[in-house]
A protein has these predicted regions:
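Beta-strand-dominated extracellular/periplasmic modules and repeats
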Residues: 1-134, 139-162
Length: 162
């Protein structure tokens, strides 16, 4: 027998009603100089993919944003160029994570692996312990940047109060 999801197991009715799951995931054209594929997977506390989530990324300087629903395997993708850094900070994207069971979206960040000096000087990233900071830095993988979101458990992504 299959039971319907309870309200606490969903993002709520407005997720389906008010938001389109149509991808708005190209913040840059694929042939733009410096264009990168940003890929990842949304994973729950048991290590299973979250196939009905949504990831929104915002250029920290506020110039661009994009949205990608997750597929059945929890995968999402974007086409981006590296955003400008704010003064005294490393280049990054701010990220909102929407997933079942959350009454409010979670906030986190994506930093770039080739910005070692800027990442070390970033006031937020440098305040985290090594394991926590590592959850916010994308990794290079087959010509793309990979950044997974782990909601709980081992290597859980760091989330911020907002």
């Amino acid at each position: 027998m299959t039971l319907p999801r309870t309200p606490s197991q969903t993002v709520g009715p407005y997720y389906a009603i008010g938001l389109s799951r149509d991808p708005q995931n190209e913040l840059a054209k694929r042939n733009d100089p410096g264009a990168l594929r940003l890929i990842g997977q949304l994973i729950d506390g048991e290590g299973s993919p979250i196939g009905d989530g949504m990831i929104e990324i915002w250029d920290a300087a506020g110039h661009r944003w994009g949205r990608s629903g997750t597929d059945a395997d929890g995968r999402f993708s974007f086409v981006v160029t590296k955003p400008d850094a704010l003064p005294g900070e490393a280049p990054r994207f701010d990220v909102f994570v929407f997933a079942r069971g959350l009454l409010r979206h979670e906030l986190t960040r994506i930093y770039f692996p080739d910005e070692t000096a800027a990442n070390a000087a970033d006031p937020v990233l440098s305040a985290l312990d090594g394991a926590g900071a590592a959850t916010l830095v994308a990794e290079e993988e087959d010509g793309a940047l990979r950044w997974d979101v782990r909601m709980q458990g081992d290597r859980a992504t760091v989330f911020f109060t907002h």
